[in-house]
Amino acid sequence: MKKLKINQNIFLAFLLLFSSIYTLKAQDSKVVLSESKLTVLGTSNVHDWEIEAKAMSGKSHPTIVGGVLKGIKSLDFAVEVEQLVSGRKGMDANTLKALKSKTYKNIHFKLVNVAKTTITSTNNYSLETQGDLTVSGVTKRINQIFLVKVQGSKTIFSGKTKIDMTQYNIKPPKALMGAIKTGAAVIVDFKVTYN
């Protein structure tokens, strides 16, 4: 009887271990393009402008236990520079030139650490993070606050980031022989779904 009880305990321990490993592996996820949006918002001496990312990719590895976000093991995200589209050919050409798109194909973010996780409501979290942002071959460590929603097998990351283009050796684009000048700072507004 004792031997049977010990065997049952070993079996239960093995089952719990196996199921927790399976749960963690099941959390690897990729960007769902159809459910994601990233817009770059900028200014000029004439009018405000915006550019939308039409191609994005990336992977995330959140740790979710019982539907609760316990941490983010890894997160990366990339935007294809040549798929940044404003709908204005001249502006798009100037943007690609400024970002040196022939040499640097992607803008890339990679999570370095999560400093603080706050539960804001059921299945919603605020993450204070640091990550490496690479634009036009220049990498800078940035602070980024993510609002994260856990929705079944999906994790949805949203937020805004202010970027000074000159810190990445980018000359703000000009148009009409310099008559239209864009501001050096842009806001990146994003909502990216991983599944």
Language model feature labels by segment:
Residues 1-30:
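Bacterial Sec-dependent N-terminal signal peptides
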Residues 26-195:
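Low-complexity, acidic/polar, glycine-enriched regions of mature
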